[in-house]
Structures are given as C-alpha cells and as structure tokens.
Amino acid sequence: MAERGASGGGSGGDSLDKSITLPPDEIFRNLENAKRFAIDIGGSLTKLAYYSTVQHKVAKVRSFDHPGKDVEQDHEPPYEISVQEEITARLHFIKFENTYMEACLDFIRDHLVNTETKVIQATGGGAYKFKDLIEEKLRLKVDKEDVMTCLIKGCNFVLKNIPHEAFMYQKDSDPEFRFQTNHPNIFPYLLVNIGSGVSIVKVETEDRFEWIGGSSIGGGTFWGLGALLTKTKKFDELLQLASRGRHANVDMLVQDIYGGAHQTLGLSGNLIASSFGKSATADREFSKEDMAKSLLHMISNDIGQLACLYAKLHGLDRVYFGGFFIRGHPVTMRTITYSINFFSKGEVQALFLRHEGYLGAIGAFLKGAEQDNPNQYSWGENYAASSGLMSTSPELCPTQRARSGTFDLLEMDRLERPLVNLPLLLDPSSYVPDTVDLTDDALARQYWLTCFEEALDGVVKRAVASQPESMDAVERAEKFRQKYWGKLQTLRHQPFAYGTLTVRSLLDTREHCLNEFNFPDPYSKVKQKENGLALKCFQSVTRSLDSLGWEERQLALVKGLLAGNVFDWGAKAVSDVLESDPQFGFEEAKRKLQERPWLVDSYTKWLQRLKGPPHKCALIFADNSGIDIILGVFPFVRELLFRGTEVILACNSGPALNDVTYSESLIVAERIAAMDPIICTALREDRLLLVQTGSSSPCLDLSLCTSRTTTCMVLPFAMWVLWTKLKSLVEKCLSPLSILLACSVLSAKSRLDKGLAVLVRERGADLVVIEGMGRAIHTNYHALLRCESLKLAVVKNAWLAERLGGQLFSVIFKYEVPTK
C-alpha cells in the first residue's frame, strides 16, 4: 500500500544554478509588497505562492453640488472624474524547476522589503530537503504542512473560485478539452493523487475528508520500470516514447486469446487481456516505444479501475485526478479517462484540473493565512498575468510556451465581496452563462478572434485619449496592445488555455489587460459627455411618453429601450457611426431599428401580460451609459413604478467599455430625481433601489452576483444624498474622529448586509429584465429563471445577425414565462 500523503519524486534538485538571470517584471511581480509566503517542493518542480498588495489606478466620479440648477440649461458636465490610486490584494503562484531554486531564493531575498511575516509554509517531499536552504536564504522559519491537507484545501479553492477549472479530456473529440461549469456545491468528490504512489481521498466538506485507500503502483512505478525497460531516465522522455508506441505489439489482447469468439463474450477484441503478455512467448526484441506504451496502459488501467471501485463503493460520480503523473500530459489523461469510462460504464467522470500543479502551494498558503480568513472572499483569475494551460501537440507531452520555457504563472485578484448564484436561476447546477462555446465552434472562434484583433487599434486610441495629461499614456497603451495581441495569438493556437473560450472571456481578458497598464476606464469622458447630453433630453422624452395612450406608450417605451441599446461603443458598426456623425441621437437610433415583426418578437405576449396585475418587483440589469440608461431604461423604470412595481436597478460595480457603473447610476438618478416626481418619490420611499452587480464585465454571469454589501451599496437614496453632502462637509470642517462618528450614524440606518442576492429574495422579485448584446445574447440567451424574464437587445454585429437569421440592427425581444 502506498504511504499516506506520498507525493511525486524525482531527481533534478541537486544542481543549483546561481547564474540564471530571472525576468522579475514578468515572473516575481509585486514581490516588494509580498506579505505572506508558501511553497510546495516536489522532486523536480517547485510551486511558490505569495500574497501581495497591488496599487493601481481607478476612475472615480463625484457629483457637483449645484442645488436647484436647471439641468436642461446646464452646460457643465453632470459630474467630475478623477483617477485615484487604490490598493487591492492579489495572489501570485509561480511554478519553476528545482534547478532554479537557489537563484529564485536569492532573488526573493534581495527584493523582499515590505514583508512582516517571519514564517513560510512548506509542503511536499522537498520541504525537508530544502528546509535549511530556505531558512538560510530568506531568514524565514519553515513550517511544514501536511501534504494531503494542502492538496484538499487547494482543490476546494480552485473548484470554488476559478470558472472552468475542471475538464474532461476526450482525445478523439474536437475540442479535446471539455470544461465543466462551476457547480454550486462541489462536494462530495474523490481526489486521486498520483505521485510516486497513489492516494485516494474522499472529500465531503471544506474541512472533512478521509483517506480511503491507495496503491504502491503509481507514477514512481511507471518511472522506475520504464527506466529499467528503456534505459530512459527522464519522466517526460518516457511519456514521449509511450506516445509513439503501439501497445498491441507487447500486450496480449482478447482477440489474441479467443479469436473471433470474443463477440459471444460481449467483449471488444482490442481489450487488453494481459499486459506484456506477448513478451513471454515472442523471440523478437520489443521497441522502447511499445514497452513504454504498454507500461503506461497497465498502470493507468490499474489506477482507473481502483478509482472507479472506490467511487462506486462510496456513491461518488466525480473523480478528480492530480499529481506529477498527470501534469496535463494528453497521453496520460487519455488512458486514465478510457479506464474510468470502461470500468464504470460511463457512470463515473474522470476530471482533471487546469491548475492541479498548484494545489499544494495554494493549500499551504491557505493554512498559513487562516487567521485572515481568505475563504470569506471570492477570488478571480487575472487573465492578463496568468499563463494558462500549456500547449499540447496531438500525441506528445505538453510543449512549453516560447514566452517562458521554465516558469508558469497564475495570478488571482481578491474581489471586493463574495459572489453567489442569483436566487432566481431555475437550476444553478445546469446554468451555463455563455451562449456559444468558441472552443467548440471553429468558425465562430476564427471570426471573433479576428474581430478583436481588428478592433485593437481603436481600443489603443481610446485608451490614450482617455488620459490626455499623462506623459506615458502612449507607451502604456502600446504595452497593452502587445499583451492583448499576444493573448489572442495564444488563443488562436490554444483556445482552451483559459478554460472555455467565449466572447465574454475575450472581452474580460481585454479589460484585465487594460487595467494591467492603468487604463481603468477608457470611456469615462465619453460616458460623462453622453450622460450630460441625455439628461438634458430626459424631460422632453417623458413628456412625449406621457402624452400617449396606454397601449401606444408601452410600445414607445420598448422602442426607447431598444433605441437606447444602440449606443454601444463596443460595437464597431455603432462606434463608426458615432465617430463620423456627432449628431446621431435618440431619434436617429429609433429609425435604425428593425420594423416589427422583430427577429425574436414576444412583444404581443408582453403587452398582454401588462394588462394583468403589476409585478411585485422587477430586477433590471442595465447596459450602457448615456442615452441607454437615461432615455431608455429610466422611462421604462418610471412606468413600472407608476404601475406599482418595485424596481431593483443593477449596474456594473466597475467600468467596462461604455457600460454604466453603479457610481454613475447614483449621480444620474440624483439628477433625474430632481426633474421627475415619480423617480424622486420612489427613491425616497425605497421602492427604487440602485445596486451593484459585483461585475466589471460587458457580459453577465448570473452565478456571480453580490451576496453582501459595503457601505452605500444599497443605501436608500435620500440617505445617499445626505451622506455625500455630509461627507463633503466633514472633510472640510471636522476632525477624523467626527467623520468616523458621522459615518457610523449613517451606517446604522442603512442596510449594509443586503446585497443583490439578498434583495432579490427580500423583495420577492418576479420579473428579470436583461438588456444588451453582452448580457442578453452573448450570455443568458438560454438562461432559465424561476420567474418571468425579458431579454432584449439590438444586434449590432452583422456576422452575428446573419447567424441568428437577421440583419444588422435586428431586434431581440424575448419574453419568457417559466413553466408552472
């Protein structure tokens, strides 16, 4: 039986090369601000984890204090924009060969200036071997952590925090990688760690797991026997040999024993009846490749059958495989997958992890950071700084990316608040946000990658224009271009590098790269100008709507919503118009819309519903700033309020393209309330609530909504106005203690613990309105909800419109009622 907690072994750590020059800007980022360390040292690879603070720029908006000013005659912008420095938390994970150990430790020691920690958590077999070296170099005490505990903690962490972390490997499919959506409940599962031996662990909860079995036949067996059979000493070279071999030359198959009679047994003739069975009777020599392939099949089948038996014994249908034996090698994943499928008859899933190599380091870090309670936060993968899955050739083991052949990177940003499933999802476990999987659709993948490449010049130009006073804006924008272009080229060759490739992930990666080079909100000035212009038109639009009869007004409101949605700077067809024709406005956008019947047209059904009783509460996910939110969404909100429906208006927490942010929506609502008694009364009576989604994406993932809030997130509007005025006053006149007291008074009267998910439950939301291409077409088009839903957008991309069976500016108006 394998020793409990055994990890991978190997040589390679004896040669400590100090002459290596490390690229610090790319590898050990933010090291000077590192606060806590952990390390997982295997036989040949080391994984380092550290927590650091990152300073970056954020765009802030603040309302001008102009009481009683006529908005229609006001020529000043509705708010001011400032760029401030903000500090956030980030986790860094680096994987490198043990050959680099001493050079890396020297580099860390020379650049470690702000750490307060005196301890480094260490796990893995090498934690003992390198203990003295680490303590000498870093002058930190090494605390050794249990290998299995660290693996489980790390596995739980990545399954909860990284979308598309787990995948099935299907060699003969296109794509080979089938990523799993994050399940709201990851437990229970089986973890099979294949190091030198095999450990099998049943994981039931965050803190409860049990070692239930193992085997002495594991990665060490493959390596050892392989070395004896082939005289090949390196593990990866053994796998390369195996990938080129034909096991049937060495193994005795069922058809070799039974001939054609195997069909009467219900068995395939190609099944292995006896591993290495032919070697006992054949006189000829066998090739190294064939022997390596036979050995790999023998060990993988043994492990697969063992895992399958334990899974069935404990009633589990998910088995995650990890350990140095796996390491993303296609030939290994293929044989294990085949074994699991065969022995379980398809009832048990063999799953692998994108970041399985980091599990021990992540777990060791979490053990050391328990007093900081890192699990109370949500964490997100930073696409700009992470290297993703390594590339693979069809048969051989993974080849390293040319960018960095020795170092592999993962970075995760701490989000401001925990994110949870929207309670209105019909079945969170089967919810898939994205409409099209680009890893699966080659034609769509090539189109969208080309589309994002062609748009890159415009994004760079917009980024530079957003910071006219910055001396280095052009230089930073060029670095952004190179970084994002590189990501797009990686995704052309490895569409699976960051999990399932979608339009959403391409947009999010672009936003991550912009933030990486301190372009937090390239469209801030565009939004400021468009919000100011739209506010001047608000009263005339509502007066026009109020003059219509009821039925005519409902259609006008919907057309207003759709016309507002045209103003999307992320769509080239629109940005070209807006840049060439500055006079293009609300009425012109209405004329662009497809005439009814629309491409998807549920309007008649919606109108019929409006003739019934009002909805209790509507949750509206807004899209763009300017005309969209002010002349499209707010008149629609106003009508719902007039009918007696409460409204929760949800906007992005952070900027993305020209999408409206929560902080901008507060100022816009303040200005509209000064003009409109319906909006003003609803805000004062807490029937119109402004909330943030927790997202900074042009798309919408309903499995990632805010579960709790920070100050002012769901502050009643009158309280927010009072807060902003009082804050301005106390900053000028009062001491810090007085400010603190004033804040505490306001906080006590506000609902600080009610985030979007909580509000939806409390208010009994029975209607969800999702607006815009990113939120209602690229994502959530097929999302099933427990309540009525309205998904509407204007298709502003000709290729997508044609795919949907329409033309540019076709209309999607999809009203759905859940089955009883």
From Swiss-Prot:
Residues 2-402 are annotated as: Pantothenate kinase. The keyword Metal-binding applies. The modification Phosphoserine is found at S393, S404. Activity is strongly promoted by Co(2+), Ni(2+), Mg(2+) and Mn(2+). Activity is inhibited by EDTA. It catalyses: (R)-4'-phosphopantetheine + H2O = (R)-pantetheine + phosphate; (R)-4'-phosphopantetheine sulfonate + H2O = (R)-pantetheine sulfonate + phosphate; (R)-4'-phospho-S-sulfopantetheine + H2O = (R)-S-sulfopantetheine + phosphate. Residues 403-820 are annotated as: 4'-phosphopantetheine phosphatase. Expressed in liver, kidney, brain cortex and eye lens (at protein level). The keyword Cell wall biogenesis/degradation does not apply. It is found in: Cytoplasm. Its EC number is 3.1.3.-. The modification 3'-nitrotyrosine is found at Y320. Acetyl-CoA binds at S196, S199. Residues 1-13 have a biased composition (Gly residues). Pfam families: ARMT1-like_dom, Fumble. Subfamily II proteins have an EGMGR motif about 50 residues from the C-terminus. This motif lies near the metal-binding residues in the putative substrate-binding cleft 2. Subfamily II proteins occur only in eukaryotes, in two forms: as a stand-alone unit in plants, and as a C-terminal domain of pantothenate kinases in plants, animals, and chytrid fungi. Homodimer. Interacts with PKM. Phosphatase which shows a preference for 4'-phosphopantetheine and its oxidatively damaged forms (sulfonate or S-sulfonate), providing strong indirect evidence that the phosphatase activity pre-empts damage in the coenzyme A (CoA) pathway. Hydrolyzing excess 4'-phosphopantetheine could constitute a directed overflow mechanism to prevent its oxidation to the S-sulfonate, sulfonate, or other forms. Hydrolyzing 4'-phosphopantetheine sulfonate or S-sulfonate would forestall their conversion to inactive forms of CoA and acyl carrier protein. This is 4'-phosphopantetheine phosphatase.
